[in-house]
Regions:
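Residue-level detector of alpha-helix boundaries and kinks
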Residues: 1-2, 114
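Short, small-residue-biased leader/transition segments that mark boundaries at the very start
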Residues: 2-6, 11-17
Length: 201
């Protein structure tokens, strides 16, 4: 998508590079105010169809995870639906797909607020993300959260609700899905499932 509306420069204090198919005049004027910031115009290209990883004395060639589930394919599993959060949920889902597992991502107003990455448990990834948001002074109230794989226990959504998250997206598929759904219902969160995990190691 071309960047058309001029974002407030204060929203991106640490962003040094923006890549977009285009920038309108207002967006360019705002984004170019920061010294040494790079604005790169580039049309999207085709992604590789496979990935290659070294494995001991050989290589592992596997299909690349190029898919992304559209909002119309999601299932709302809770009593509360938040269609107004769909844009942030999709944005968070795209980010979490490219982050090392176990991982969760918080997003609001199409901005990454924090991510917890590469943890041995999902709840540790969530705690890491909450702590990062606090350290940067980012308010998680009204934010959306994406997880690269299912929640094994309801503690993740409970902690997310305590942090201010209002909507969650995850693949689903845990034997404890109902417990996480019940925890969301008890706290007024919306939960969407995609049926597809984006596990990355």
């Amino acid at each position: 998508l071309m960047i058309r509306r001029p974002p407030r420069s204060t929203l991106f204090p640490y962003t040094t590079l923006f890549r977009s198919p285009g920038f309108d005049d207002d967006a360019f004027a705002v984004l170019s105010q920061k010294k040494n910031r790079i604005l790169l115009e580039r049309q999207p290209g085709d992604l590789p169809k496979s990935t290659v990883r070294s494995a001991l004395n050989g290589y592992l060639v596997q299909a690349r995870d190029n898919g992304m589930e559209a909002a119309g394919a999601w299932t709302c599993t809770t009593a509360t639906a938040r269609p107004e959060s769909a844009e942030d949920l999709l944005f968070a889902l795209k980010l979490v797909k490219h982050t090392k597992s176990n991982t969760v991502v918080f997003a609001k107003n199409s901005q990454l607020l924090a991510s917890g990455t590469g943890q041995t448990s999902r709840v540790d990834a969530l705690k890491q993300a909450v702590e990062k948001a606090k350290n940067f002074g980012f308010d998680l109230n009204g934010s959306s959260m994406a997880s690269d794989a299912f929640f094994p226990f309801p503690d993740c959504v409970e902690l997310a609700a305590d942090a201010g998250v209002v909507a969650v997206i995850q693949p689903g598929g845990s034997i404890n899905d109902e417990k996480s759904i019940d925890a969301c219902d008890a706290r007024g969160l919306a939960m969407y499932t995609t049926g597809v995990r984006h596990f990355r190691h």
